[in-house]
Structure formats: structure tokens, C-alpha cells
Amino acid sequence: MKKLLAQFCFVLLVISCGNEPKKEKFSYDRVKEEPKEVVDSNTIILNSNDQMLFDKSVLKAKVGEEVNLLLNHTGQIGKEFMGHNFVLLKNGVDVDDFAQAAMLAKESEYIPAGDDTIAYTSMIGGGESDQISFTVDEPGTYVFLCTFPGHYQIMRGEFIVE
């Protein structure tokens, strides 16, 4: 009986080890990729966060084209303590003077009276967004910034119009 069991185990071992696994052939079919949604070349998405940063320091546009700018605040702190906006200044405006005047303009969301701006968004807090459309008619390098008190020195960049 032991011999029979030993022979049976040996045969079972030979059968299980002697067979190579079947090699499967894979074929890959080319699949036409669906076009992804393309954002217009004149649409700019600018993100801001609770660390007082914009995700871009240089923005570009073409002369005379309408620019659609979407400002997102990806943080969680409300606009009373960590508000952000986008303000595009006209050429020749002194950034420091403008920012000092903006700090005193709380009732107008830190946008001082006057005609120093080309465009600006509303002040937004964590999880909020604002979208604006504007056109710049002259080529040049303009300054954009956030006018919430204390932010403009870090949250600023160049808006290049070609």
C-alpha cells in the first residue's frame, strides 16, 4: 500500500512539474484616442493657495485678444484672513504706492479708487473662484498682483502681451 501511494505521489509530481505553462499571445489593437477637451489659448487658469502663492509667475496673452482668466483659491482659509484677487496694473503704475493705497480700501475689496488697473477679480477665499474677461490693446510687460494686505510682495508676476 505504501509503494502504491509512493508511486501515485511520484506520478502526480511528474505530471505537475513536467508541463510548461501555455504561452498566450497578446495582441494590441490601436485604439483611436478621443480628443481631450482643449482650453482656448486665451483662457488662463491661475491658482492661489493658503501659502500666499500664485501657481504661475508669468502669464502671456496676445495684443487685442480677449483674455478669460479664472482665479481659483485652492486653500481652505476664508477671504477675511487669506483672501486673494488678481489685479492687472497699467504700465507705469508704481506697485508699492498702489499696494499701500489698496491696504486702505477694505470696503472696495482692496481695490483703490482711480484708473490704475486694466482688470481685476473679486476677493475670494478658500474653495472659491472668480472669472473675468478683458482685453489688453498694447504690447508690453504688465504687473499682476494680489492686493490683500501684505500679499503683494510675494503674490505678483508678469503679464506679457505680445
Regions of interest found by a model, annotated:
Residues 6-9:
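Sec-dependent N-terminal signal peptides
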Residues 57-81, 86-88, 130-138, 143, ...:
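Beta-strand cores of secreted/periplasmic/IMS beta-sandwich domains, seen most often
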Residues 94-138:
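Extracytoplasmic beta-sandwich strand-turn segments characteristic of Greek-key/jelly-roll folds
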Residues 24-30, 72, 119-162:
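Extracellular/periplasmic metallocenter environments
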Residues 1-4:
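Positively charged n-region of N-terminal signal peptides that target proteins for export
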Residues 37-67:
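N-terminal edge beta-strand
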Residues 15-16:
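C-terminal motif of bacterial Sec signal peptides marking the signal peptidase cleavage site
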Residues 19-44, 90-110, 151-162:
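Extracytoplasmic/periplasmic copper-protein system
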